[in-house]
Amino acid sequence: MGSNLPYAADAESPLKPAELQVLRAQYEKEGDYVGIQTKFNFAWGLIKSNARPDQQEGVRLLSEIFRAAPERRRECLYYLALGNYKLGNYGEARRYNDLLLEKEPANLQAASLGTLIDERVSKEGLMGFAIVGGLALAAGLVGGMVFRGAKRR
């Protein structure tokens, strides 16, 4: 991540395993009666993780909070956007981030994450074009060799 995007530092800074374990222990301790704040804290820690299964679980927990607690939706939006960004779900990431920016146009963290999302989409889009172009070139070369070989017979 570039140093020109300090507000999106959450995108690449996981918690230490011991810190995540504290959040997990509290979440598991509360069991069936887990509080919204405990669930949010654990989801936040999971999303910051570099492990894809943790990120997926974090997005799932935040989605539950988003649906069940309308008063907490705004604070879920950024981390839903971040989690989806880290999972490569750029359309979902952009959707959540845009919702947050509609509510808070001056939110520098969301603006910074929006830039990261746009950069990743552009980069992967260019890679996709390069792959398709390379395949087309290879098919053309093979086709040319087959055609040339057929002409010689």
UniProtKB/Swiss-Prot annotation:
InterPro entries xref list: Fis1, Fis1_cytosol, Fis1_TPR_C, Fis1_TPR_N, TPR-like_helical_dom_sf
One Pfam family named in its UniProt record: Fis1_TPR_N
Protein's membrane topology: Single-pass membrane protein
Gene3D superfamilies for the chain: Tetratricopeptide repeat domain (1.25.40.10)
Localisation: Mitochondrion outer membrane
Entry keyword Repeat: yes
Intervals, Cytoplasmic compartment: 1-126
GO biological process, one term: autophagy of mitochondrion
One Gene Ontology term, aspect cellular component: peroxisomal membrane
PANTHER family with a match to the protein in the record: MITOCHONDRIAL FISSION 1 PROTEIN (PTHR13247:SF0), TETRATRICOPEPTIDE REPEAT PROTEIN 11 TPR REPEAT PROTEIN 11 (PTHR13247)
Comment on protein domains: The C-terminus is required for mitochondrial localization, while the N-terminus is necessary for mitochondrial fission.
Protein name in the entry: Mitochondrial fission 1 protein
Organism (species): Aspergillus oryzae (strain ATCC 42149 / RIB 40) (Yellow koji mold)
